[in-house]
Structure formats: C-alpha cells, structure tokens
Regions:
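Charged, terminal alpha-helix-loop-beta segments
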Residues: 1-159
Length: 159
C-alpha cells in the first residue's frame, strides 16, 4: 500500500470518525472464487463485533497477530495464506464489519465501484454482515460525494 494511502488509513483508524472494533489492513478478498492465487485486496476491514484493536501492522498493536507476519521467503507464506487458514476455522464466523477504501488526493468514482466490488468478494469468502462502507480521502470531490450518497457509502475526509 503506498505510503500516502497508508498514512490516510492510519489517520482515519485513529480518529473519532472510525468505528470501534478489530482492524485488519490489506485484506485479501475473493479467496474462495476461482484460481487460489488470484484475489483482490480491500484496504481495511473493521470487525465491529470485536473489542477495539489496532491493525496488526501498527507498532502499538496489542492483540493476537492472526494474519500479519513479516515476509519470510524461507517459509513462503504471505498474508493471503494467513487469511485462507483463518477461513478454515470458525474464529471469525458471523462477524459484523465495516469495509474501508482509502485514496489519497481526490477520490475517484472508480474507487467507489472498487469498494462495492470488494464488498461482494468479501461476502463470498466470509459469513460476515457488512454494516457500512466507507471511502476515506483527503480531498473533497463533488462527483464522488454524490455517488457515495446515492450508493450508501460514507465519504470521510481526513486531513
């Protein structure tokens, strides 16, 4: 994830505008569909039915690291492998979640479409109820604001 987008996500997660819950960044979605090596990635997911917990990648994360591991070429496992393994358990069945996309600068209408597509892929993988979709950016756009309003996506501006 590019640095600007990562900083934007972190600012949102740490703000009062974000939901409370367990956060994951760069969540692979579509793992249950087609080629196992082909998947999309949603910027962030907050499991709102869980106690508040920062993303595993954050240095001040104090929970269980379920899926994030430093890259280790000898082991050959990546984050998608971690999520695949986690899907095989019932640890996170029936969760309520918020799906988040972030785009630095002015968001594009395409980012809204990507967010909706990522939601459908996530729902195919997990037995989760998506409570809300959020598009985070640092610049307003009248077109994106209109599309978000029409499609029930919350547009959040983070400075």
């Amino acid at each position: 994830m590019p640095g600007d987008r990562r900083a934007l996500l972190e600012a949102f997660i740490r703000s009062d505008a974000s939901p409370d819950g367990k956060w994951w960044l760069d969540v692979p979605v579509g793992l249950s569909i087609g080629d196992p090596d082909t998947y999309a990635t949603v910027d962030a997911v907050c499991l709102t039915s869980r106690d508040p917990e920062l993303p595993e990648e954050f240095p001040d994360h104090d929970g269980v690291p379920y899926v994030y591991r430093e890259v280790d070429p000898e082991i050959g496992l990546d984050k998608a492998d971690g999520f695949r393994a986690l899907r095989g358990t019932d640890t996170f069945d029936g969760e309520s979640v918020v799906v988040v996309a972030a785009e630095s600068g002015a968001s594009s209408v395409g980012a809204v479409g990507d967010l909706l597509a990522h939601q459908k892929l996530l729902e195919a993988d997990w037995d989760w109820t998506v409570e809300e979709r959020v598009l985070v950016s640092d610049t307003d756009s009248d077109h994106v604001t209109h599309v978000c309003r029409e499609l029930s996506v919350r547009a959040v501006r983070v400075a």
